[in-house]
Amino acid sequence: MSPLATKALRPAATDPASIRNFCIIAHIDHGKSTLADRMLQMTGVVDSRSMRAQYLDRMDIERERGITIKSQAVRMPWELDGQTYALNMIDTPGHVDFSYEVSRSLAACEGAILLVDAAQGIEAQTLANLYLALENDLTIIPVLNKIDLPAADPDKYAAELASLIGGDPSDVLRVSGKTGAGVEDLLDRVSRTIPAPVGDPDAAARAMIFDSVYDAYRGVVTYVRMIDGKLSPREKISMMSTRATHEILEIGVSSPEPTPSDGLGVGEVGYLITGVKDVRQSKVGDTVTTAARPATEALPGYTEPLPMVFSGLYPIDGSDYPDLRDALDKLKLSDAALVYEPETSVALGFGFRCGFLGLLHLEIITERLSREFGLDLITTAPSVIYEVTSEDKKTVTVTNPSEFPGGKIVSVSEPVVKAAILAPKDYVGTIMELCQSRRGILLGMEYLGEDRVEIRYTMPLGEIVFDFFDNLKSKTAGYASLDYEPAGSQDSDLVKVDILLQGEQVDAFSAIVHRDKAYAYGVLMTGRLRELIPRQQFEVPIQAAIGARIIARESIRAMRKDVLAKCYGGDITRKRKLLEKQKEGKKRMKMVGRVEVPQEAFIAALSGDTEKKAK
């Protein structure tokens, strides 16, 4: 057994040869945060008294959903064969929406632990992140977790892992994050096999930002990995992409609580605080250098994360609009991938059009807005970016159905993604059926073991963002996993379906759909609204239209007073007169009447709560 390190190495004075930078690649729920907890305990960084489950997941929402959203970096001491090592573990998110965060974290490491649940095997997102790691030339340590589970089948999955990355099944480590079995061997293996960082200590300082977090008291905390040179407190630094200069107020390492130090040297991972209040000043993936002696070229491999999914966020109470703006500004401080701009809707009032990396990102942002800022919001149906070319050869970029141009349209192009679905082989038929119904084109399939298949499709992103993932999970009893990456765009026969209430268009319900699906969408929405809008004193027609052509209609029957109640028996002409009079009144009402759509109806129609009833 490796003893605990008697004394930790001092940051800024650590020889790069004894530094090991690694990250853990795993799918959601494969036990990455629990394994990280055990490592923190075994290296003595966190004592057992202050230990809590998922120690590194700071946000409530991360702990509750059991997912990691922001990357964290922790420095841990470990002793092996008489030498003390400084292990820097960079915790990465496992979800497809945050693949940019993953790529930044991987770029800061030399090695990766590929963590797989011994009861479930490899999932699609783990594969995607593994390919990213291999592209970055990282040393991979395969590990099976949860071997204490009764359902675990380590031998089968060890063989699967070994065949995937090349190697011997006996090299696959078996650990249990829960009981701590095998974690020491894993730390020994990390110290032995992961290469030490390489850099020039005398060159101009260059550090890569792999995460930045907003702290309410200290401003932006920037996590960096030093490549060359060193940084010290009170030094003036400059960001290479924005050319902004700041002074380092504090620099140090997380262990896992922030610990100030005398600086950071080659290969070290730590944080710096400059007192800046805006995360956009320290972009993830940017290069930090000293202002006095700047580096000539920035580090490669950085891109701006582009939003893939757009949705409108509107406060239920219009007076909350300024609060929503402040809340989004604050979230933007800690989430550089979020983009938003103000927009107005006739039906919903003032709000923001926001761009997200994917559906989970959208869900997390809306949940954080309601949780951390106490806002009640309506979220419109998610949409993607369309390029619409009209007859006069003008091209319009549409992120919102209301921007879709009228008149003759030559072509509409939509983003396409390459999707990889991993599932047990029994479900291949149902998955193919689902993908074909979503306009997917089969690229190929591969058997990863004797009973697991990877199926690859190209699909329009617009078909995935709405409810594809939920359908996939329900059709495969939760076994399938999905990963997708952008793959350009394609021209499609897309139309805009408008929903009309009493002849007036309600912009919140408009959608851009494929012509073959337009009728189904029209029937679904009109049926849904018929259930939700309260009956009026007059009949209200709900119509779905493409341009001027009505494709579906439902009517909300009028409420009627029983005008014949006072006639006991009596002449039929008397009754007819009263009924005709009522009819006239209703007609007049219909001419001037306006339909108020209650807020609840908007929320329910947009979130699909009434699907059961509407059918």
UniProtKB/Swiss-Prot annotation:
- What is its biological role? Required for accurate and efficient protein synthesis under certain stress conditions. May act as a fidelity factor of the translation reaction, by catalyzing a one-codon backward translocation of tRNAs on improperly translocated ribosomes. Back-translocation proceeds from a post-translocation (POST) complex to a pre-translocation (PRE) complex, thus giving elongation factor G a second chance to translocate the tRNAs correctly. Binds to ribosomes in a GTP-dependent manner.
List its EC numbers. Answer: 3.6.5.n1
Tell me which UniProt keywords the record has, alphabetically: Cell membrane, GTP-binding, Hydrolase, Membrane, Nucleotide-binding, Protein biosynthesis
**Which taxonomic lineage is given here?**
Bacteria, Bacillati, Actinomycetota, Actinomycetes, Micrococcales
Q: Which SUPFAM superfamilies match?
A: EF-G C-terminal domain-like (SSF54980), P-loop containing nucleoside triphosphate hydrolases (SSF52540), Translation proteins (SSF50447)
Q: Where in the cell is it found?
A: Cell membrane
> What is the enzyme's main class?
hydrolase
Give one GO molecular function term: GTPase activity
> Could you say which residues form the signal peptide?
none
Q: Which positions in this protein are listed as binding GTP?
A: 29-34, 145-148
Q: Which family does it belong to?
A: Belongs to the TRAFAC class translation factor GTPase superfamily. Classic translation factor GTPase family. LepA subfamily.
Protein name in UniProt: Elongation factor 4
A single Pfam family it belongs to is LepA_C
Query: Mind telling me which SMART domains this protein's record contains?
Result: EFG_C
Tell me if Electron transport is a UniProt keyword of this record. no
Domain tr-type G intervals: 17-198
Gene Ontology CC annotations of this record: plasma membrane
Q: Name one GO biological process term.
A: positive regulation of translation
Give the catalysed reaction(s), semicolon-separated.
Answer: GTP + H2O = GDP + phosphate + H(+)
